[in-house]
């Protein structure tokens, strides 16, 4: 029986969505209103729609993708003055994502990234930030299959446009951006390792800067680390690259040497950066390490055991004052399961963590 107005029964719907950050998506009706703003904008929207209609996914060779992208790029130039939102943005993003299919040659990928860069260049930063969720799904997997000629263009798109946005626009996309950049630092000997690592570190500072607190400072990168831990937990294929970043940038959770007694370690003995990394959910750090210790690749297990020994010893205040008992059981069980590998290098690191220095 449906509820009647005034029958005294309360609705089970929540009063709010509980979001900590605002919903930044631009409604479709806003884009439609922009498209109908004036004659120039309507003509611009018609040209884009005509270029999109020339895309036929059922009967295309790779050369046809190049021709389609050239037509789309021609339709995008020049944009009308004071353009706020790109007309038919969702359709454009869909076609660009299809042009970034791993089965297509690198020439198509380069052309598609050029179109992304063109769109991002003439959209105002607030508008790009509000519509970033439309374009990002096509960009996220690029580094996992990109050739050496495509990677610099991808890095330029991230550096020149996305990382220039305010932190309030980058925060909702932080985890996706982390996952998109981790393949670039999997091989520490690759020629683009330094650039990918630098971009990821800039993302750490940009996304973690408090919106109202001014410049970045120590202890304000907790939001980035929480997203990073989630990325490691949910994406086994990205853990090799994540390990390279953790080895260089993870805060040390070892108690201060000046503490009077290691059995009475207080919160203040943790550095500010370490306190930020476990706020508001210290269990994410534990589950991140547990996921790495149970990875199918022995090199990943070895790397996370090294991090346990150097950054997260058993006498750390994290285990004593922050995590729950079931989280402690989880990471101990995950570490102990490494002996099933019957690998001496893993066993040696495990005993170092259990027995201490």
Question: What role is predicted for each listed range?
Answer:
Residues 1-44:
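Fungal intrinsically disordered, low-complexity serine/threonine- and proline-rich regulatory regions
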Residues 81-83, 122-127, 164-169, 209-213, ...:
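Alpha-solenoid ARM/HEAT helical repeat scaffolds used for protein-protein interactions
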Residues 290, 335-339:
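Glycine-rich flexible loop motifs, especially short His-Gly-Gly/GGXG/HXGH segments used as catalytic or interaction
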Residues 18-29, 55-79, 89-96, 104-120, ...:
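HEAT-repeat alpha-solenoid elements in large eukaryotic scaffold proteins
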Residues 40-51, 85-97, 124-139, 170-179, ...:
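Core helices of alpha-solenoid repeat scaffolds
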Residues 296-304:
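Conserved tryptophan-centered aromatic signature that marks the ligand-binding surface of SH3
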Residues 32-39, 48-60:
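Short domain-edge segments at the starts or junctions of modular domains/repeats
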